[in-house]
Amino acid sequence: MLFRLPIVKFFNRILSRITVTVVLVALQLAWLAWVFFALTTGTARVWVTGVLNGLSLLIVLYLVRKDENSAYKVGWIALIGLLPLLGGALYLAFGNKRPSRRLRSKMQAVEQAHRTDRAQQPGQTAGLCDENRGVSRYLTQYGCYPAWQNTTARYFSCGEAMYPALLADLEKAEKSIFLEFFIVSQGKMWQGVEDILRRKAAQGVDVRLIYDDFGSLLGLPKDFVVRMERAHIRCIPFNPVVPLLSLVMNHRDHRKIVVIDGKVAYTGGINLADEYINAITRFGYWKDAGLRIEGAAVWNFTVTFLDFWNAFRPFEQDYSAFRPQLAVLPDSDGVVQPYADSPLDEEPVAETVYLDILAQSQQYVYFYTPYLAIGEEMLDALRNAAKRGVDVRLVLPGIPDKKLVFRLSRSYYLPLLRAGVRIYEYTPGFLHAKCCVSDDRAAVVGSINMDYRSMFLHFECGVLLLQNSQVLALRDDVRRTLPQCREVQCADCRTGLAGTVLDSVLRLLSPLM
């Protein structure tokens, strides 16, 4: 008995999903290397080399004509030029935005069938100033996410502030609970949520969970779905990792959404894992942000969740059962416009919203982002805003979770600083919030990082707040956070020749990161 527990832990560890995945990927790489070096000799190796180089050339030609973000294309073309033998294969594994036909057709069919559920109701944007009207119209017309009044919002400046409110709202659920997260990990935070979900499911509440299979790979046991389904909690592990078929899969579900009875919704950067509420310490203090909305605007997230769900487990033909008839609507507090972004179309919703806010800013614009890997268009928008006198500030982590990505983020500092952008690093720990606020009139709280993967490859979500009181709450949070940060100066960006070369290489590899 003394040795039983360590032995069980050892076998559980070596049989965990992440261990199996790493081993299978390593075996795949070893097999490919063996095929190339052992089986391809002489003429055969010349043919294989020619095929790989030809593949890289075809992908470069494909990228040149593709309607895609120019910086993203140039990054991949440069990488393929640097590694012509492997560049094409790397693009297919890591960079290809084109989803499987099956995934695209499923999502498009569901979204088209429920397009009328996203219709803009008249009079909802009345009273918006000129600077706000354009971005709201864009989200309505090109994102199909209507704007709403009669919605209250509450901003949370950290996970431990949001968590009790989330639990309290889950306890009040009477009809449905929908959850969609990138990371679900066993621990205190998930246990508190799971206990309520189990009770509510036993009471007949419709409980559903979508989680990203890759994001949750480390945190969940192999039998998680079976356990949840036995408790009448329906689950979809999105885009399951199949290591023998691909080295990595794009199109991760990076969204964070909770919808309760169609009346209350949550979003932000906070996943269901202990570090997000600082129940455990990882990379110092974990600074995040969340948003609770209640009222008419919740409908956008309800439809977003149901569209995603029905693409994989078709269930509802009519969403109206999930649209509550609110006897008393909340007083209007500006406009609230929840939205989502998808890699399945060619519309870069997340990036366009940020670009519009920057273009319309006159006094200030602040960003929270854990990562910075941006294209020329976003880089120019930040610099141009600063050059015309706007107070542009970026807040990033002081303690990184990924050191190479942090180094990549810092490689963008100098051109921004020289244009007048002010950059801060959050010294108490890791800043994971993804927010933007401008001119006391517009803000975004959501799951969207300022990097290639969020802007172009992942499923993301956010809430646009226009002339809403929580715009000021986010502004005040940023201003309270700045004294806890170290402001970066141009002198801090001197890296020497070796550092400059490393930064250049990381820029080339940025589409992979």
Give the positions of each predicted feature.
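N-terminal localization/anchoring segments of enzymes in phospholipid and broader phosphate metabolism
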Residues: 1-352, 356, 360, 400, ...
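Glycine- and other small-residue-rich loops at beta-strand/loop junctions that grip anionic moieties
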Residues: 182, 370-371, 405
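Exposed, interaction-prone extracellular/peripheral surfaces
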Residues: 353-357, 377-391, 408-411, 417
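Helical hairpin unit composed of two closely spaced alpha helices linked by a short loop
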Residues: 361, 371-393, 397, 402
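Active-site donor-binding acidic/aromatic loop of nucleotide-activated sugar
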Residues: 423-427
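Catalytic-core elements of nucleic-acid end-processing and repair enzymes
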Residues: 434
